[in-house]
Amino acid sequence: MLEYIDAHPGESGDVEFLSELASISPFHFHRVMSSYLGESVSSYVRRRALERAGLRMLLDGASVTTASALAGYSSSSAFARAFRRQFGSSPRQLAQGLHARRVMCAPCLPHGLEFRNVAAQEVLALRRYGAQHTAAPAAWAALKNCFVTGTPAAPPCWIGIPCDSPELTPVARRRYDACVDVALPADTSLVRKNLAGGDYAVFQFRGSLHALEDAHAALRWHWYPQSGARMRDAPAFHRLNDAAGDGELVAEIFFPIERAVARPRASASAVRPARNDALL
């Protein structure tokens, strides 16, 4: 249900419509979802739509008119008022505040840029909330505890998804999904999640969890604006060699881009040929 809401940011978030999709009564839908989300369904839908529109304004320079339509607002003035209530500043003020962020995160850029076309992938996911450097270890520890005794037939593929932009989403609402190959036997408390297929810019990373969070920010705010690419409407994710979150990590970071635009310009990092990659 949350994937549906995130995929339709301009919809009203009408509880009756969403409860019909979930095949339960509006009363129970609102009660269950509000308990899970920590906020009302309408508040969640409104916040996610504004965050999504805000990200397009900050990253792609989308106009207020375009962003208001993306967020489902009938007028630019209504969108601007809602934006200020949500973020405490206007889009222009927020963009100006991010200039220092771009400069600070530049040294954290990962290396080894290449382009891959990745097949869509279904995984099992476990979610935790908070800053990535605290939510990620908690999510990975809980995920490992879910697995039944036994040796998997093949080495697992561990994938981490920081779902939100720290510059726009409050710390308590930031989502981190620890994911693993669906072919592995797992406890039923895990949920199925779909990773979007398509073109990705892929970077190599080695370092700490703190540095991994900084690397994501560097791609978003420093590499992407200069790349000549356009970000697809899908989250970036990282594929880890270590699901425990302890010590130094070796990972690949996948940044979603559109095929319809020119390939991003190479930086100082070496660019390797594109290839197909099915994640596993």
What is each of the regions a protein language model found here?
Residues A7-E11:
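Short helix-capping/hinge SLiMs at alpha-helix to coil transitions
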Residues M1-Y4, R48-L55:
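Pre-recognition alpha-helix immediately N-terminal to the DNA-recognition helix
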